[in-house]
Design a protein with these regions (language model features):
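Class I Rossmann-like S-adenosyl-L-methionine
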Residues: 1-242
């Protein structure tokens, strides 16, 4: 993120350090929004599955399978814990947009999941444990959400800030799934936006020093790359070294 904002600082020509710093932290907050939003997607998929079950039961002449469906997916213990998570609920309460706004996407993704061997094997298994339920979602996330071009386009349409964030945020979501512990209930900690105040201050310091000490750092780069023609080095590479 710091590299992106430093690069933009030089490219847009405004050279307003305070405004650029504000943009850095806004960009980081949007990445954290995406983290929460992707956690919400797993709940949305489960809610859609329940909706399908309810609609099938409400038919005039439902089949026995529709009246007595396999409830294993919608009663997944990991999702039951996630949907009452206090931190996630706080985030959701402040959001105007939910996955209900993109139900067509949720429907299409759910249908791909249902057609998969991962889903079929889970539903057919007699094992009923929190660990198996959590592992199901780790596999589903990695297979259907991690590298999903349709989802990438949808997210980019919602926020330009999410264009380059998803790949790294996906790793945070997978880490979160792995860390969930049943005994923590609704108080399971999610990953924080910053590890601590010192972590946030480090980002600010690194950003400011990269810009304020630009001349000195470029001199060092030049001194240590005498065999290079710096004018021919990609500007992004110069920013990274800086």
């Amino acid at each position: 993120k710091i590299i992106q904002i430093v690069y933009a600082y030089y490219q847009n020509g405004s050279k307003n350090l305070d405004a650029a710093e504000k943009e850095l932290f806004f960009s980081l907050s949007k990445a954290y929004d995406l983290y929460n939003y992707l956690l919400m997607l797993m709940i949305a998929l489960t809610n859609y599955a329940q909706k399908r079950i309810d609609a099938a039961k409400a038919k005039l002449a439902p089949t026995a399978e529709e009246l007595y469906p396999n409830m294993k997916f919608v009663e997944n213990k990991f999702i039951s814990q996630l949907e009452v998570n206090r931190q996630l609920m706080d985030f959701i309460s402040n959001q105007k947009r939910t996955w209900e706004n993109d139900e067509d996407f949720v429907k299409g993704l759910f249908e791909k999941i249902v057609a998969s061997d991962i889903y079929k094997e889970y539903m057919a298994s007699s094992e009923s444990s929190y660990e198996a339920d959590r592992e199901l979602w780790r596999k589903l996330y990695k297979t259907f959400i991690f590298n999903n071009e349709e989802l990438d386009i949808l997210l980019e349409d919602q926020s330009l800030y999410w264009n380059d964030d998803k790949e790294i945020v996906d790793t945070f979501v997978l880490k979160t799934i792995k860390r969930f512990d049943e005994k923590n209930g609704a108080n399971q900690p999610l990953l924080p936006e910053f590890k601590d105040d010192e972590d946030q201050e480090f980002a600010r310091r690194l950003f400011r020093r990269a810009i304020l000490n630009c001349d000195y750092y470029r001199h060092l780069i030049s001194e240590n790359t005498r065999n290079w023609d710096l004018d021919r080095v990609a500007f992004m590479d110069v920013v990274i070294m800086q």
